[in-house]
Amino acid sequence: MSIPVPRPGIMELRPYTPGKSTAAGLGRVVKISANESPFGPSQKAIDAFHKAGGRMHRYPDGDATELRNAIGAVHGLDPARIVAGAGSDEILYNIARGYAGPGDEIVMSEHGFNVYPIVTHCVGATLVTAPETDLTFDVDAVLACVTERTRMVFIANPNNPTGSYIPADEMRRLRDELPGETLLVIDSAYAEYVQRNDYSVGIGLVDAADNTIMTRTFSKIYGLAALRLGWAYCPPAIADVLNRLRGPFNISTPAQRAGKCAVEDQAHVAASCDHNSVWLPWFASHMQALGLHVYPSVANFVLVRFPDAPAKNAAAAMAYYMERGVIPRETGGYGLPSCLRFTIGREDELRQAVDIARDFLAKS
């Protein structure tokens, strides 16, 4: 009997593997694997979510009007150029659907976010990977990969899982030297955490031309990962394309209401930033003091490289952490098998993570 056959390339797609959230035999664990907010959502967002529960029998606002208006007010943007998505993943996928297909190429950097290969293969395009310099997006290397078939370039700035970033002048150079018909997609999921004067989220580049998109998420600093909520700021013509591709009611009412209140509660955002600005350097310096290599990060996580010796490598360290109920993120799927990524969690979680690393490295 014959059976349906998927499109060519689909079975070559490697599914996204999220960070672990449980450890065998342990009830309570410390999860510092997914770059989630240690504070959770704003209380105002929680209240709005519960209040919206009474309207679950009604379809949501298909245009997410109040949410887009709130985002526009906070960031000084035209709401008509904002597209809401069920997580920024949906938006990234729809960008690829709208602008690439078989015979086209999509370029990303060597250790970029793992969703980019997935959306590329989903639309039948060819992925081109540019080498990085010191685990940082290399503009010249990316430009060298661009051909007449290149439809778009994905850049996460800051990058996940490395925590590195490129400054505004390099981002501008990238846009200026890309062909006008090549779409630049700036994934600014961790933008709120960056405290560098030479950093730009990408809004200016979107405003300056009709070939650049900036995407954002509510999953990180806003603490709404479970609701799947993201947004994009686009040129009007691209916003029109993305609105044609998204589902008619793609954002639930509870997610819209919670997102609106979350983005309006900038005091909660500021508190999260303050925590990160203290505990990221603390954690990095204490891991370095143990002799580990910690890569510079401007996000809410750090990438740590472990020794190559079998008993002291990242795989052994991961097992040691898991046995003790602390879960960092393995990064072999990003081409970084010698590293683990640690979310900047609460103070007690970070102190425990350092203590475990110390014990692991000291054991014979």
Language model segments and positions:
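N-terminal "arm"/small-domain region of PLP-dependent enzymes with the aminotransferase-like
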Residues: 1-58
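PLP-dependent aminotransferase class I/II
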Residues: 42, 211-295
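PLP-dependent aminotransferase-like
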Residues: 98-155
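Conserved PLP-binding catalytic core of the aspartate aminotransferase-like
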Residues: 277, 288-324, 340, 344
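Phosphate-binding glycine-rich loop
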Residues: 60, 64-105, 123
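PLP-dependent enzyme catalytic core of the Aspartate aminotransferase-like
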Residues: 169, 316, 320-325, 329, ...
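Active-site pre-lysine segment of PLP-dependent enzymes
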Residues: 121, 139-148, 161-184, 188-221
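Short acidic capping loops at alpha-helix termini that bridge into adjacent secondary structure
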Residues: 78-82, 102-105, 149, 181, ...
